[in-house]
Amino acid sequence: MSSGADVPSDAPAHCPGTQSDDAGKASACAGCPNQQLCATGPKGPDPAIALVRQKLADVRNKLLVLSGKGGVGKSTVTALLSRAMAHRNPDENFGVLDIDICGPSQPRVLGVLGEQVHQSGSGWSPVYIEDNLSLMSIGFLLGSPDDAIIWRGPKKNGMIRQFLTEVDWGQLDYLVLDTPPGTSDEHLSATTFLKGTDGSWGAVLVTTPQEVALLDVRKEISFCKKLAIPVVGVIENMSAFVCPKCTTETRIFPARTDGGGAEQMCIEMEVPYLGQLPLDPRLTKCCDEGKDFITEFPTSPAVVALEEIVTKVRQFFGDGKGERQ
């Protein structure tokens, strides 16, 4: 019997798993695009798992940020959570790892687009946004931000392995991983590596209120349950637009008429609900310009809501400093 972590996302039904002795040879493997690779590839645990565990030994908590559908603001939420925790806890260290290989956006959102990664004796040095907040992204390795990355799964997995084994993060209290939408090779690779590390880990899922987004985030929750990924909770992003002049609230993406939305979905699927982040056009502008929305607009309803979400995230990890200061 195979574990979910060694079954490729595009595998047929009844796949024996890549580590099985029947990999590439079972009747279920007929017609699978991975058949030849599985039949001839090495069996047994990936030796990189032990190396990742060693390299991340000083990383206390690992947080995956997931979304079922693109365009729900997952990368924005990743940046907001990371900045908010770094601001609140200046005596702690935070890292962001952008594993959205084909669509790296963190360098722009965090205001370090065009920076270069430097090599040291202990590996790649991440780019620092603040004294206690650093970032690694494939965006730093491209000749131009307009360059397309056209890679198949194995090469993406190799890049993630390299990020986890060759980046000199140092001591971190939180490593936040920005992932691509859906449940793809990047998610399977990251999950396999993180499961073998010490410390705590879990996933925050980001959605918008409308049913078409909730449909996919339900699948993401199912993915987490199948792979035993602890679910920190669900954030409903762009829940409403709050006018900065009159504070009138308008639902841009209304939920189902039967009282749905992310909160009801969390009740149905028995996962924590972390809260709502209202839509603020100023946040979009800050992301485009790489500015810190939290310090630019500290009284924004989005920042107020974010602080409450950060408290819940830190409490999930058993952090006594999760309470608002």
UniProtKB/Swiss-Prot annotation:
[4Fe-4S] cluster 1 binds at residues 15, 29, 32, 38. [4Fe-4S] cluster 2 binds at residues 243, 246. Residues 1-26 are annotated as: Disordered. GO terms for molecular function: 4 iron, 4 sulfur cluster binding; ATP binding; ATP-dependent FeS chaperone activity; iron-sulfur cluster binding; metal ion binding. Its cofactor is [4Fe-4S] cluster. Belongs to the Mrp/NBP35 ATP-binding proteins family. NUBP1/NBP35 subfamily. ATP binds at residues 68-75. Component of the cytosolic iron-sulfur (Fe/S) protein assembly (CIA) machinery. Required for maturation of extramitochondrial Fe-S proteins. The Nubp1-Nubp2 heterotetramer forms a Fe-S scaffold complex, mediating the de novo assembly of an Fe-S cluster and its transfer to target apoproteins. Keywords: 4Fe-4S, ATP-binding, Cytoplasm, Iron, Iron-sulfur, Metal-binding, Nucleotide-binding. It is found in: Cytoplasm. Heterotetramer of 2 Nubp1 and 2 Nubp2 chains. The gene is Nubp1. Binds 4 [4Fe-4S] clusters per heterotetramer. Contains two stable clusters in the N-termini of Nubp1 and two labile, bridging clusters between subunits of the Nubp1-Nubp2 heterotetramer. This is Cytosolic Fe-S cluster assembly factor Nubp1 homolog.
